[in-house]
């Protein structure tokens, strides 16, 4: 009886572990969430873009030769969205580079993130927590359990060249300015950050070229129940990019979600001043008028 119970326990555990890899969300356009592996990406419908972009990758042989002798001391975590064009382009290239460099794939952890609003860029297992992932793909290089550096959204040169530059300690990723603001928010907290908003906008915020990074970060924070941080960073985004509709619409939706309909209405009207026929703002104002 004892042996039977042990066998049943083993089978149940094995089944659970098997189910935790390559989990698919059966939406109109299916996508993967949670931990995945190469086999999952080689399975339809993902194989249609994975195999094409894997084969399209032509890594530099000279760089690969250096990675073959240096990369084995590291581990890698890659976060992607199988629904994301940048991920579909870069993650197959990552696998191509790692295969060429003879990097053992058991030292690679690949995590697919959700795209639904209430779990935006989250993983069911929470693997992205504390990893400060806000754009995908994000490819993080570790040594002895400590982060060395990361590729955010796309490489500066190529996957292989960027990995080598990270190993050499000579690399600054895309969205470094957004990452710095994220860390400042963590240091100050949303209330103090809000009080210093004008100063932050003049200093750190002045480095930003567009609103997309903070916009995505706000959505990630809001889905992760960091609403105060999301609202504060979106206020900064509105201040930095007053002629952009996106941050105003996002902040208005947050205000509406909190029942601050007057504040939401002001923001929707500001959007209409920028674009008189904006359907989202028009419909929102009609909705607010009925409340």
Residue ranges: model-predicted function:
Residues 107-141, 165-167:
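Thioredoxin-like thiol-disulfide oxidoreductase module
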Residues 211, 227-228, 245-249, 279-280:
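Helix-start (N-cap) detector for alpha-helical repeat units in TPR-like alpha-solenoids
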Residues 219, 253-254, 287:
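Residue-level recognition of tetratricopeptide repeat
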Residues 135, 142-178:
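Non-catalytic, surface beta->alpha helical segment in thiol-disulfide oxidoreductase systems
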Residues 215-216, 246-250, 266, 282-284:
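Alpha-solenoid helical repeat scaffolds
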């Amino acid at each position: 009886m004892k042996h039977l119970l042990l066998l049943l326990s083993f089978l149940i555990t094995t089944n659970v572990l098997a189910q935790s890899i390559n989990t698919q969300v059966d939406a109109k356009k299916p996508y993967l969430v949670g931990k995945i592996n190469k086999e999952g990406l080689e399975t339809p419908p993902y194989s249609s873009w994975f195999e094409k972009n894997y084969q399209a990758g032509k890594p530099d042989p000279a760089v690969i030769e250096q990675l073959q002798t240096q990369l084995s001391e590291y581990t890698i975590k890659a976060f992607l969205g199988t629904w994301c064009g940048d991920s579909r382009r870069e993650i197959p290239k990552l696998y191509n580079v790692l295969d060429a460099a003879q990097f053992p794939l058991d030292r690679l952890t690949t995590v697919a993130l959700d795209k639904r609003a209430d779990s935006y860029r989250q993983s069911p297992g929470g693997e992205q927590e504390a990893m400060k992932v806000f754009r995908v793909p994000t490819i993080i290089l570790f040594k002895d359990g400590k982060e060395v550096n990361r590729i955010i959204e796309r490489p500066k040169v190529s996957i292989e060249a960027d990995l080598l530059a990270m190993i050499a300690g000579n690399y600054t990723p895309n969205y470094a300015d957004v990452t710095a603001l994220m860390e400042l928010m963590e240091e100050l907290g949303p209330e103090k950050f809000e009080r210093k908003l004008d100063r932050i906008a003049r200093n750190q915020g002045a480095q930003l070229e567009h609103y997309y990074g903070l916009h995505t970060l706000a959505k990630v924070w809001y889905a992760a129940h960091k609403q105060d941080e999301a609202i504060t960073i979106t206020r900064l985004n509105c201040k930095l990019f007053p002629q952009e509709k996106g941050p105003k619409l996002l902040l208005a939706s947050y205000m509406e979600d909190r029942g601050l309909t007057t504040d939401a209405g002001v923001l929707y009207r500001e959007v209409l001043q920028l674009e008189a026929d904006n359907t989202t703002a028009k419909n929102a104002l009609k909705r607010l008028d009925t409340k």
